[in-house]
Amino acid sequence: MPTILNLLNVNKRGRTLHDMRHDSKDKQTFRMKHLRYLLLAGLLALQIPGMAATHPIDVQPAFWWSGMHNTSLQIMLHAKDIGKCNVSIEATDIKVDSIYRPANANYLFVYLDTHKAHPQRFHLSLQQGRKKQRIAYELKARDNQPKAQGFDAADVLYLLMPDRFANADATNDVVKGLKENISNQAPDNRHGGDLAGMTRHLNYLDSLGVTTIWPTPLLCNDMPAGSYHGYAITNYYEIDPRYGSNKDYKLFVDAAHKRGMKVVQDMVFNHCGSENFLFTDLPDSTWFNNNSCYTQTGYKITAATDAYASQVDKFNAQDGWFVSSMPDFNQRNTHVMRYLTQNAIWWIEFAGIDGIRQDTYPYADRDAMAQWCKELKTQYPHLNIVGETWLNSNVGVSAWQKDSKVAKGLCNSELPTVMDFPLMSLLNSALDETTNEWDQGLARIYNYLSQDAVYADPTHLLTFLSNHDTNRFACVQAQADLKWRYKQAITLLLTLRGIPQLYYGDELAMAANKSKGDGALRQNFPGGFANDSINAFTGEHLTPLMQHTHALTRKLLQWRKGCDAVKWGSFCHFAPKEGVYVYARQYKGHVVTVMINGTNTPACVDLAHYAEVLPKPYAHDVLSGRRVNLDKGSLQMGVREVLVLDFKK
C-alpha cells in the first residue's frame, strides 16, 4: 500500500517523494518533507480512532484534472475504519455529489461534481464525532503535451517484455519489502529488465523502423512468484518499483515522443493479482465475480457471442477466474467500473500514452467494457484501443470489433481494434506447406483474406507472427534456419492489411516452443544484460543468421515508413496459380505488387494474368534492390522466392 508520504503530497510537477529520493539535488528537500510527513502521519493517527501509523490513508487517484469530459470524480479513501467518517469539502465550485460506503468500513468512496471547477488545491474534511482530519487534494490543469495520438495501419508495434529486454539500473533489482526479486535467470523468475533499459535503447528500436512500443504491463505486481509477466496487478496507480517509478515511466514516454515514436500501455481490467489490496481487504463481496470466491473459467469464450450458448457456459466463460491467483473483477458493479475507467484516463493524462492494449478482453463484461471504450473515445477521439481477442476464427474475432456485422443481439462493443489470431495461426503453418490452388500453403491465406467482409474494419486488425503467449514464429531452431520462411512471413505481415506487430527478437530469428513453458518464450534480449556474449543493440557478435534477419527486417520496416500504398492502399489479390500467390496495394496511383512462390520448385509467372497490378514494364524490388523487367511476358521466380515490386521508383 502506498505510504502517506506519497498519498498526501504530490508537488506541482507530479513528483512523489519516491521520485525525489533518487534525485541527488532533491535529497535535502526529501529529508525535510520526510520528517514533516512522518509528524503529520503521527498526528493523523491520533485523530481517527483505530488509525495507526502503520495504516496510512490510501487515496486513489492521488490527483486529477479539471476540464475533463466526465465531470464526476470518484476518490477512493482506504484506511482503518475510514468509512465511519462524515465527509465535507473545502473547495471552490466543487461539491460532494454522493458517498458510497461499502460493507467494509475501511473504504470510503467520495464522488465529486467538478463540472464548474478550475485547477485548484482543496481539502476533503473527515469527521467522526469530535475527531477531524483534512486531506489535501489537487485538481490539476491539463497540459498540451502529446497524448492519446492513437495508432493505425501506418504504424508497426513492437511488443517487448520489460523484465527481459534490458537491465540498465541495477539499484532496483532488489526492492526491500517486495515479495519477489532477482534470484537467478530461471525462465519464470525475474531477470531485472527495467524502464531505464527500455529508454536507453529507444535508438535501437527507432533505427530498426518500428513506430510504436507495446511493453507488457509495467504496474506493480507484488506477487510471491511469476511477477515478471505483469498480468497480476497489485497496485493500479504505481509502476512496479523493480522497473522504476511513475516519473521514470513518464520520462520513457516523453523520450519516445521526442523520436516521433508512440507508446501503447498494456492494461488488465478483467482481473488483478490476489495480493491487490482490493482483494485482500475487500470493499464488499460484489467487487469480484462469484461473490469474490474462486471459480475457474472454462475458457470457452465463444459462449459470450454464441446465440445457442447455455447460461452456465456463458457464466463460466465470463465470470470464472483465469487462475486462482487472479481474482476476476465484477465490471457490472458500477463502483468497480468507475475505478477502472478513471485509472485508464489517469495514465493517459499523467504519462501521455498513445494507445491501450486491453488484456483478455472477451472475458470481461461486454456492456461495461463497451461503455469504457465509449468514454475514452469521447475524451480522446484519436485514441486507439486493441483488445486481446484470442479466438480461432474470423467470425469469433469479428464479433468483438466496433460495429460488428455478426454480433447479433449484443451491444456494440465500441472496441476499435481486435487481434487477428486466425491469421497468426495461418502464417505459422501455411508457409511450411507446398502451395496448391485450393487448400494448402498460401492458398489458405488467400482463402482467409477472401472472407474479410466478416470484419467491420479489416484495416483495424492487429496482425502478428507470434507474441508472449504463443510459440515463437520459429518454434525450433530448424525453422529459424530456413531464411526463406521468415522472409515470406515478414513480407506478408508488413504488406497485408492491418496494423503489424513484431515480438521482440523476431528480428533476430529467436526460436522458442511453448511446450517448455511460458518463460521459455520470453528470453532475455541479447545485449540487455550483464555478461551477454551477443549484443544486438550494437551488433557485436551477432550470428550470420541474426545479421541476415535483422537486416531484412530493418530494410522492410524502413521502406514501409515511406510507402503509403502498403499503409493505406486498397487490396487486390489473385487466387494462387502454379504455386505463386500475387497481391497488390494501391494508393493514389502508387502500386506495390507482391509475388510469393509457395513451392520448392522454380516458377514461371505469366505476367499477362496479372496485368491489372503491373502498371509499368519494370519495377524496383525492395528486397534485392534490383530493377525487375516485366516486358517479356513471363517472369522466372526461384524456389520460395519473394518479390516486393514497388512501381513508384
Language model features: what each stretch is:
Residues 65, 140-159, 164, 168:
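Low-complexity, Pro/Ser/Thr- and charge-rich linker/hinge segments at domain boundaries
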Residues 630-649:
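C-terminal beta-strand-rich structural cap/linker in extracellular carbohydrate-active enzymes
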Residues 132-141:
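Edge beta-strands of extracellular beta-sandwich domains
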Residues 253, 271, 343-345, 349-455, ...:
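Active-site-proximal helices and loops of the catalytic beta/alpha 8
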Residues 165-345, 350, 369-380, 384, ...:
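Substrate-binding/active-site clefts of carbohydrate-active enzymes
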Residues 53-83, 141:
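Beta-strand/beta-sandwich contexts
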Residues 69-121, 125-129:
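Immunoglobulin-like IPT/TIG beta-sandwich domains and homologous Ig-like subdomains
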